[in-house]
Amino acid sequence: MSIWIQNAKIATMDSANPLAESAVVVGGFFAFVGSLQNAEAYLQEHPCPDISVLDCGGEFLMPGFNDSHMHYLHYAKSKSSVDLTGCTALSEVILRMRRGFEQSYRPDSGLWLIGEGWNQDYFTDEKRFPTADDLNEITTEYPLLIMRSCFHIGVLNQKAMELYGISADTASRFGACVETDARGIPNGVVKEEVLDDIKSFLPAPSAQQLLDLLVDTQTDLFRNGITSVQSDDLKYMPADSVYTILSLLREAGETGRLRLRIAEQALLPQKSELDQFLYEKGIDDSYGNRTFKISCIKLLADGSLGARTALMRKPYHDAPDTKGLAVYDQASLDALVLEAHKNNIAVAIHAIGDGAIELCLNAFARARQEYPYLHPRHGIVHCQITDAKQLRRFKELDVLAYIQPIFLDYDIHIVTDRVGRELASTSYAWKTYIDSGVHTAFGTDCPVESFRPLPGIYCAVTRCDLKGNGPFLAEQRLTREQALYGYTAAGAYASHDEAVKGKIKAGMYADFITLDTDLLTCPAEALLHANVTRTYIDGTCVYNNVQR
């Protein structure tokens, strides 16, 4: 079916034709974008007998949002977890978990009761991590796990520690990733790679059930105008089912059951896993189809700022006994990046602290030096704490910045305390990235934050939190055009899709949305209240909430 779009303010993200009033869709692609008069002329020359008119009623139309880094499967699974976001006291965390246990937990299920989203910085009673003792008040017979909002810290009760194999006798095996008390007894707090391994250890649905969950969840994103995501999911799949699930996702894209475009950021933190992926399974960034593909290899170099596990070069300003946690030393990270690079596959590395970012930049520099004729689009995910020299190295090494503007909502209240005023003054420097020509793609890290793009756009253009507090480094404010580009065309570039999506332009996928608010001209506060009214993928409406 063909569509003639009329009566819309179209923000195209195409610098050669930034605004339009009409477009024609044929066969799932934009065939024409421009003025209404020229659209009429185009249709006279290229008749479309089956064409229908989409009268947008003067609404704002733009490309569908592209979240450049999230955890889609984790979000889908988290809908069945106990929601601990917004807890303002440790006692409230325990109360919500107790209610979840009493009201919805089935002891015969063999599953763990999971809670997600707490943040000790918001507690008004005790500003500390929960412990096993706290969770043991609920039950010691069945396994409980609660994860901090950053998902780099978790807390197990006694039963969960027993099942996973954490005890006083084994604690030393896990190093700094398992906390112990003064007696050397684990207190239930687990971090980083141990928590990641626990996620894979948990009892899980079958591969087919996971696929059903992913398909059923896509409507949540369509309601918010998201048509594409770049998602880190592999560690949320049963280890023995990863390749089955990848195959099912590819098949679901081919059959049309999966409409959301997913570019997998394949988390493969061990050399053996990467080798199996590349050489035994023969998977690379050509795997997939128009809907599901592999876009890059994903690695993690450190933890989170809120939990003080992000790796810093100097001790934390507010915790001088720690610099955070390094997942790799330089040689180990170099080896992984080099293996992907020589296969011309991009690597996107989670790095928040300036210490981790330095490791990443060094690894990319070495790979480019060894194989200068290859140009995979390496990137750093989060890239929050930086100094001026590191900001320059992003451009020098052609490293992508995957940023999450919504992080300002929380981080502006802690960053100076965590890293000191001098280093904070060159951090979250998104305008510096863009002005220097660094490809800067926006995302949310959902479910760390909500996947809703509009709050992130608000933070990007105001540098304030969602209550209007701020601004933090006002000189780093972005224009509306820059913010919308970051959530559309820049994300397409990050997944090697800039030729087919991210813009309203002839020859590109007809993935577009309409909103009841002009995002280019409305007051900043109105960004938080704008509504997506329609979402289209391949010229087909997948969400419609038009009220007139």
Spans of model-derived segments:
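Short proline/glycine-enriched turn/loop segments at secondary-structure junctions
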Residues: 285-286, 522-527
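A structural microfeature
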Residues: 31-32, 534, 543
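Acidic (Asp/Glu)-rich catalytic clusters
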Residues: 253-255, 282-292, 371-373, 394-396
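Glycine- and charge-enriched low-complexity intrinsically disordered segments
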Residues: 544-548
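Divalent metal-binding segments
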Residues: 2-7, 11, 15-279, 299, ...
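Non-cysteine beta-strand/loop elements that form the S-adenosyl-L-methionine
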Residues: 71, 289-309, 398-409
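His/Asp/Glu-enriched, well-ordered alpha-helical/loop segment
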Residues: 338-348, 352-378, 382-383, 388-392, ...
